[in-house]
Regions:
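ATP-binding N-terminal substructure of ATP-dependent carboxylate-amine bond-forming enzymes
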Residues: 1-100, 104
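Conserved small/polar residues in nucleotide/adenosyl-binding loops
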Residues: 158-164
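Short active-site oxyanion
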Residues: 64-68, 116-118, 150
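ATP-grasp fold ATP-binding core
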Residues: 109, 133-154
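Glycine-/Pro-rich loop/turn segments that contact NAD(P) or position catalytic residues
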Residues: 97-136
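Short glycine-enriched loop/turn motifs at secondary-structure junctions
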Residues: 41-42, 90-91, 113-115, 143-148
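General beta-strand structural signal in soluble alpha/beta enzymes
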Residues: 70, 89-91, 118-121, 139
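Short acidic-hydrophobic, aromatic-tinged amphipathic segments that line or gate anion-handling sites
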Residues: 47-51, 120-123, 154
């Protein structure tokens, strides 16, 4: 029996490490990346460059693999769902959708009695002022942040007469 061909969406550091580890157990890998020079290109059995929302690219990827995983969460849910209709995607697309939004993810964890660090949702300057006692802290975007991107160390709160933003 042949080992399955693993499709990996994303060709960055994690995709590269996964493809390299797969080689050691004779698993073929196909990396799909929107970066033509992604590092994973050098580790995968096959490399497909294209946009994640391009039907031809996605179909070529689906036809080249047996199952799919991804190295980062910022892949549109609709794309993962479409791929999952033809090839199994793990973690499930619904899990990815949950973790794409930090606020939704934290609420889910807390509702399921899983401890998280203390957090508050800040939508404007007024929300920040109400929680000034929590400073210093990190101000994070709720979506599209990764590896420190979308995160800002916040130590002091300056007040002004400016309108609430």
């Amino acid at each position: 029996m042949n080992a399955p061909t693993l499709g990996i969406i994303g060709g960055g550091q994690l995709g590269s490490l996964l493809a390299d580890a797969a080689k050691k157990i004779d698993v073929q890998t196909v990396i799909l990346s929107d970066d033509p020079d992604a590092p994973g290109k050098h580790f995968a059995t096959k490399f497909i460059f294209g946009q994640y929302d391009d039907d031809t690219t996605i179909n070529n990827f689906i036809n080249a693999v047996d199952l799919v995983t991804y190295e980062f969460e910022n892949i549109p849910f609709t794309i993962l769902k479409k791929i999952n209709e033809k090839k199994k995607v793990l973690p499930k697309p619904e899990i990815n959708k949950l973790i794409q939004d930090r606020e939704t993810e934290k609420k889910f964890l807390n509702e399921n009695n899983i401890a998280t660090t203390k957090y508050v949702t800040v939508k404007n300057k007024k929300d920040l002022s109400k929680n000034a006692d929590l400073l210093p802290g990190l101000l994070k975007t709720t979506t599209l942040g990764y590896d420190g991107k979308g995160q800002y160390k916040f130590c002091l709160l300056y007040t002004s007469d400016a309108a609430d933003e």
